[in-house]
Amino acid sequence: KREKSFDCTECGKSFKRKSKLKTHFLCHTGEKPFVCVHCGKGFRDNYKLSLHLRIHTGENLSVCPDCGKSYTDKNKLIVHMRIHTGEKFMCSECGKGFSDFYNLKSHLQIH
C-alpha cells in the first residue's frame, strides 16, 4: 500500500502528515501563530515556542561546560561544542571543513 503524501503548492516539498504540511506552509506566508507571552516572539509551531520558553524559565537548559553558554535545545549545544573541540562539518564534495553546519549548507550550494 502506497502512503499518501501532502505536497506544498509553493515549493513541492512532500509530507506524510497534513499537519506537517500546514506548519511548513507558514514559512511561505511568514505567519507565526505561536507567540511568547513573555517577550512577544513568534513561532511557526508550538514545539519551538516550548523550547523558547526555557530561556525565560531557565528550565532544562543545556549548558556548555567550557564557556557556560546555555541552549534550549541540546542539539544546538552539541553543535556549539565544536567550537571548543575543533571538530568540523566536512564537505563531501571538496573536503573543506566548517565549524558551523549552516556555513557548510551554504557552501554546498556552490557545488
Swiss-Prot record:
Q: What is its main location?
A: nucleus
Q: Which GO terms describe its molecular function?
A: DNA-binding transcription factor activity, RNA polymerase II-specific; RNA polymerase II cis-regulatory region sequence-specific DNA binding; zinc ion binding
**Protein name as it appears in the record:** Gastrula zinc finger protein XlCGF32.1
The protein's matches in Pfam families, at most eight in alphabetical order, are given as: zf-C2H2 (PF00096)
Task: Give the UniProt family note.
Answer: Belongs to the krueppel C2H2-type zinc-finger protein family.
**GO CC, any one term:** chromatin
Species this chain originates from: Xenopus laevis (African clawed frog)
Q: What lineage does UniProt assign to this protein's organism?
A: Eukaryota, Metazoa, Chordata, Craniata, Vertebrata
Q: In its keyword annotation, does this UniProt entry include Nucleotidyltransferase? A: no
Superkingdom per UniProt: Eukaryota
